[in-house]
Amino acid sequence: MVIDGQQRLTTVSLLLLAMYNLMKKGIVVPAKASLGEQIYETYLVDKWQDDDTRIKLKPVKNDKEAFDRLFGDEADYIQESNLTSNYKFFYERIQKEEISVSELYDAICRLEIISITLNQDDNPQLIFESLNSTGVALSEGDKIRNFILMGLPSKEQTDYYEKYWNKIEQCTDNEVSLFVRDWLSVKQQVTPAISRIYYTFKQYVYDEKAETEDLLSDLLSYAKRYKVLLHGDRCNKNLNACIARLNRLETTVTRPFFLEVLRLYDDRKLTIDEVTTIFLTTETYLFRRSICDLPTNTLNKIFLTLHKDIVRLDGTEDDYVAKFKYVLLSKKERARFPSDNEFAEAFASRQIYQMNSKNKVYVLERLENYGTIEDKDIYSAC
């Protein structure tokens, strides 16, 4: 297991592979004819291994397939992969022959590598944090992944990565840091600063004495709900349309609350129609506040504690929709839900064209499509 330096190893491997493929095709010619085979057999493959294990570099699952295909026909490359993009950069740059392929290989051979082997009792996570503290910062999500998986035996690492972590990354569109921030908000009713997500997560795990698989299972459950908030995949057209509109308004402060609403749906405490009602009511609340020019800096706290405020009314999650509406309508002053009269008066005098772009287009789209059988695509024209 490599604790630190995976990106450097991957970059050098892509460079060497681009050099090898260019020499193999005769596009560039080295000073020594055997250089291509030397690179291939020394750095890229172990020819004594079976076909499925002979490639030396073993990236994570999604990247592994992309890297492996670079050894074959270009038609089979995974074009949307960052590995493929980086490989193609090297492939095209080498052909300019700003330096010869032989000179490039000599430069690679002068790279210095420090190898530190840990003892059985050493803590790889602490070593990693120490090494990474002065390097290029990893994302908070990367640190969390390493914190969860790094101390496990190799087989468990692989199993948990495949069963949980890879799926979490896919569900969150690889925005694990932001997802975990919302997950922590659900768990603690406090939103950590972006730079403190990892440390807040680590402290939470220590405080809760969470078992690794239980932790990953819970994260995956919430990640699946997070996917709904990103893309909408419930069988309700109105809900999906509402989610799309909220995302265009970039109302991310609602996500901790919506994650709990979707949990209640998964627990069969809410129907899909009730979930849709909650989302649409929230959309109305946000839109009315925007038209009435109420401050947005109160929204984070409102939605952070909204689920807890609802449950506090009678100590249960029963009759959730009615209690949700009651709590919102009970908000006062800067947190209030504007009445019909307040909204109508504000809308009549609001300078819509002076609103920020996302809110302005939202208003125009709603005026155009509300109550129609077939929606017109307003957003692509704006």
Report the location of each language-model feature.
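Generic low-polarity alpha-helical segments
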Residues: V2, V12, S100-E103, R110-L111, ...
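Short low-polarity hydrophobic stretches
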Residues: N132, F258, T282, S380-A381
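Short helix-capping/linker segments at secondary-structure and domain boundaries
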Residues: L22-G26, G135, R263-I272, N369-D375
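Histidine-centered nuclease catalytic patch
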Residues: G5, Y362-R366, T372-C382
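A cross-family structural signal marking well-folded subdomains
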Residues: E112, G141-V361
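Short, Φ-rich (hydrophobic/aromatic) sequence segments
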Residues: L83-E97, L219-L229, L364-L367
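Generic recognition of flexible, low-complexity loop/linker segments
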Residues: S100-E103, I113-I114, C242-R248, D377-I378
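Glycine- and hydrophobic-rich flexible loops that cap the catalytic core of alpha/beta enzyme folds
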Residues: M1-S195, T296
